[in-house]
Amino acid sequence: MSRHTDLVRSFLEQLEARDYREGAILAREFSDIKARSVAWKSEGVCSTKAGSRLGNTNKNRYKDVVAYDETRVILSLLQEEGHGDYINANFIRGIDGSQAYIATQGPLPHTLLDFWRLVWEFGVKVILMACQETENGRRKCERYWAREQEPLKAGPFCITLTKETTLNADITLRTLQVTFQKEFRSVHQLQYMSWPDHGVPSSSDHILTMVEEARCLQGLGPGPLCVHCSAGCGRTGVLCAVDYVRQLLLTQTIPPNFSLFQVVLEMRKQRPAAVQTEEQYRFLYHTVAQLFSRTLQDTSPHYQNLKENCAPICKEAFSLRTSSALPATSRPPGGVLRSISVPAPPTLPMADTYAVVQKRGASAGTGPGPRAPTSTDTPIYSQVAPRAQRPVAHTEDAQGTTALRRVPADQNSSGPDAYEEVTDGAQTGGLGFNLRIGRPKGPRDPPAEWTRV
């Protein structure tokens, strides 16, 4: 058995030996990552002077996610026309130490030109997008791509849509033609349509498909992968980390001391809050376990019990709280890491089905779990608004028109709503479905059922 196979097997066995199913070790690891990140900022190891300058602050989507000076992407294209060198983006090193990834935020209306300056100057061929334009009624990313029969113009750049296809239920692939000073280039964009902010997808399958497809489109030529979500940290960090580990597997360069903790820690030195929440950190472990499991099955056919041994790791250690259950689309077996089996997707979370009801005076998040409603339960209130079905602001252009949408090169920030505080995304309070409902106080008469003897 090769040394590479031994290292892969050792990592999987280590997960079981350390009893990751309890989750305590992963929680401690992620707390350590956050603590070190805070220390780096306070000690000046990771400075943000450029992004904090007066002329650049309105180019940051979120006030607390600012590009690190040491690894920030510096724009030189079109500087002679008065455009600055700052964009909220950082380089992340690949397995060979090169600038393999550009982690950036979703463009703002007044940074669309800067985004396309970045794509053109650094020869980006593939863009991975892990968010939607609008999520939960809030604008997360300005549309920087063209629609069918609707070209987009950003300064001197003209973008047209060549082709749009749906790879599966989660991923849309667009091929764009970008024109700048009479030169044409093709840029591919992969958009993951259903990854919740601060959360995780319902399975690893389509994430692995997205990363694999990106590498097929990228080919062996130069140029970094451009990866973004809304802030360019949480979901972006997961994608970069998954591709990084996958490259280690494909090149058989897993180091003897391989550690996902160290992988994420190193990425956080290059991009703020990469892999932003503990849930995303668990999902990363879950996905990497699937990658390692598949690799070991391909290279060691006699290790038949691996899948059974790793099933608890995938099912329990990395229990994923998601906002929706999406069916996984199986892919035909082929080369290494092309078909990854994952646990069945979880059922819809209670928060998406029932209204938030909290008993007065009870601590948030207490109780063993929700009580399922029965057919005999009497509704207490006449109208309940499900939490997951918030109104969504539709800001897209009308269909059926063919026009160039011109984006001004410079534009002031759109106001306070352009910024949002980015937290760790953890649930600070439970829903308390198991709690009984007390009598409502007020002028309303209680339901008749309460007065029956």
Curated annotation (Swiss-Prot):
Q: Where is this region: Disordered?
A: 384-453
Output the GO biological process annotations, alphabetical, semicolon-separated. Answer: blastocyst formation
Residue ranges of the Tyrosine-protein phosphatase domain? 26-291
What tissues express this gene product?
A: Highest expression in bone marrow. Also expressed in kidney, lung, ovary, spleen, thymus and lymph node.
Family as reported in the entry's similarity comment: Belongs to the protein-tyrosine phosphatase family. Non-receptor class 4 subfamily.
The entry's function note states:
May be involved in growth and differentiation of hematopoietic cells.
Q: What is this protein called?
A: Tyrosine-protein phosphatase non-receptor type 18
The root-end lineage is:
Eukaryota, Metazoa, Chordata, Craniata, Vertebrata
